[in-house]
């Protein structure tokens, strides 16, 4: 399949606490993407600081790390045609107030500081984030029986 790629998606502590894990996974599955990695964990502050290293000079960095460390997260790797770009569209804007209805943030969020989900913003950042959160042996290679019904 041409342009098949992987993206990193993380359901943040507020999404876990609000019971939205199943709904979010359902949306990605129904779209036709394939789940190839999944972890439920309490992320360490060191992991979070590395993950958000590009934001380290921003005034909200310390609060972001504290928030992400405040509860469990669901870390996932999804695979499919243009999954990075399409995944970002499915998430909605970082600020939920700017997100359209039908997007995850548009349907379930109100405030930017509690926007329930993270998604890689480029193929390059997806590769970095996946390697940070997952070991290669934790990612599963398989062909979905639905693949021929999703892709030409």
From Swiss-Prot:
It catalyses: a 2'-deoxyribonucleoside 5'-diphosphate + ATP = a 2'-deoxyribonucleoside 5'-triphosphate + ADP; a ribonucleoside 5'-diphosphate + ATP = a ribonucleoside 5'-triphosphate + ADP. GO terms for cellular component: cytosol; early endosome; mitochondrion; myelin sheath; nucleus; ruffle membrane. The modification Phosphoserine is found at residues 120, 122, 125. This is Nucleoside diphosphate kinase A. SUPFAM superfamilies: Nucleoside diphosphate kinase, NDK. Its main location: cytoplasm. There is a cross-link at residue 100 (Glycyl lysine isopeptide (Lys-Gly) (interchain with G-Cter in ubiquitin)). GO terms for biological process: cell differentiation; CTP biosynthetic process; dTMP biosynthetic process; endocytosis; GTP biosynthetic process; lactation; mammary gland development; nervous system development. PROSITE patterns: NDPK (PS00469), NDPK_LIKE (PS51374). Its cofactor is Mg(2+). Hexamer of two different chains: A and B (A6, A5B, A4B2, A3B3, A2B4, AB5, B6). Interacts with PRUNE1. Component of the SET complex, composed of at least ANP32A, APEX1, HMGB2, NME1, SET and TREX1. Within this complex, interacts directly with SET. Also interacts with TREX1, but only following translocation to the nucleus. Major role in the synthesis of nucleoside triphosphates other than ATP. The ATP gamma phosphate is transferred to the NDP beta phosphate via a ping-pong mechanism, using a phosphorylated active-site intermediate. Possesses nucleoside-diphosphate kinase, serine/threonine-specific protein kinase, geranyl and farnesyl pyrophosphate kinase, histidine protein kinase and 3'-5' exonuclease activities. Involved in cell proliferation, differentiation and development, signal transduction, G protein-coupled receptor endocytosis, and gene expression. Autophosphorylation at His-118 increases serine/threonine protein kinase activity of the enzyme. Interaction with the SET complex inhibits exonuclease activity. It is found in: Cytoplasm; Nucleus. Belongs to the NDK family. ATP binds at residues 12, 60, 88, 94, 105, 115. The active site is at 118 (pros-phosphohistidine intermediate). PANTHER family: NUCLEOSIDE DIPHOSPHATE KINASE. It is linked to This protein is found in reduced amount in tumor cells of high metastatic potential. It holds the Pfam family NDK. The modification N6-acetyllysine is found at residue 124. GO terms for molecular function: 3'-5' exonuclease activity; ATP binding; DNA nuclease activity; GTP binding; identical protein binding; magnesium ion binding; nucleoside diphosphate kinase activity; ribosomal small subunit binding. Keywords: Acetylation, ATP-binding, Cytoplasm, Differentiation, Endocytosis, Isopeptide bond, Kinase, Magnesium, Metal-binding, Neurogenesis, Nucleotide metabolism, Nucleotide-binding, Nucleus, Phosphoprotein, Transferase, Ubl conjugation.
